[in-house]
Amino acid sequence: MTTIGKYGPSEPPWPASAGRLELIAVVLVPRVKITVPSLPSGFVARAELCASLDAGAGAEVALVCAPAGYGKTLLLADWSRTSTGVDTAWVGVDRDDNDPRRLWAAVVAAIAGCPSVPQSSRLHGRWAWRPGAQPEFFAELAEALQALPRPLGLILDDVHELVDPVALHGVQILTRIKPATLQLVLSSRFDPPLSLPRLRLQGRLRELRAAQLAFTPAQAAQLLEQSGLRLSPQQVEVLHRRTGGWVAGLRLAARAVEQSADREAFLTHFSGDDRSVADYLVGEILSGLPEAAREFLRVISICDLVPIGLAVALLEREEAGSVLDRLERETSLVVATGRARQAYQVQELLRTHLLADLQRRGPRRPAELHAVAARWWAACTAWPPSGGPANTSRCQPSSTPRTAMTMPW
């Protein structure tokens, strides 16, 4: 355990005229919280992404953002071990860090534990935290960081766990004080509520998202082979297409294929409704969403690619486009396509799970939705818009979920 002092609440138990602070408690930081996670056997290194993080050191803030199961934590753990340009300090963020005293105790302890931090550094001292004295705390932290002899990458993993306004404001301050020695690296399942547009405009933000984290067919083949599974190139291509390169989906598929008596039949029917995949999707992704958001996703799951106008018709909500945009920003479960951002896609395994869930609730609703989609496409004369995606969209008929019904673009 590493300890760091904390001071009183915003209403201190001493007279304001006393002009002093009193130590009232100590925060214990578990060593595992500030230790870089180990890499599992069969780990597929992503040298190109590590190089991108190295190249982004001058950007000051790096954001690795994708839904659960895309390998964010393992990528950053690998980068932390292999980067030669910066030392790294690791903090695994969890819900308890919505107590800002715990969060910043862990941050200071992680930084102080870096070998390049000299023993004379202020970072090895006792630190005080008071909600009413955040500017002073961060000014002192910035000064201590500025004095470091080498650049430092501070990794806050799973920053989506932070919802407390004070804790988030502290991270926001850290993006503003800009000590020259610090690169702040955030991993999250969705965009954290920080000033990301401002950072982009200033050229201070480097981003890695699901599209970059998704495995290529070659990386998928390497992962499957290292899992002890030898498949033909055609079988690998099928799994890669079904999973979209989603790492967790590939791992779950590999385990299921090993246990299957008929590999070809499994690969033919593998979808997001496979039990192991469905359990992961529900437990790690969908359970954290409100029912209204889950229902929205179920409805749009009838099509591979959903233009905003079709979403409006399916949901009977004029603001469906705004909801899609919000889902993209806050969950990363849908992705806008094309320069015009006029259509959205749901990750394939998640979409097939949602479609099966919709069908289990009765045949009437899927049939009604397909009828709405058919009428919308029949009336659509100006698709794709300029700059929009040019390939076709397919809506799955509820009676034959694996048979495509091609709609005009």
PLM feature spans:
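C-terminal boundary/linker of central alpha/beta nucleotide-binding cores
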Residues: G19, L63, P67-Y70, L74-R81, ...
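Alpha-helical sensor/transducer elements of the RecA-like P-loop NTPase core
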Residues: E22-V36, A45-L49, L74-L76, A105, ...
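Conserved phosphate-binding/catalytic loops and adjacent sensor/switch elements of nucleotide-binding enzymes
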Residues: A68-Y70, L74-P151, E161-V163, F215
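Walker B catalytic acidic pair
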Residues: D157-D158
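Extended alpha-helical scaffolding segments used for macromolecular assembly and cargo binding
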Residues: R364-W409
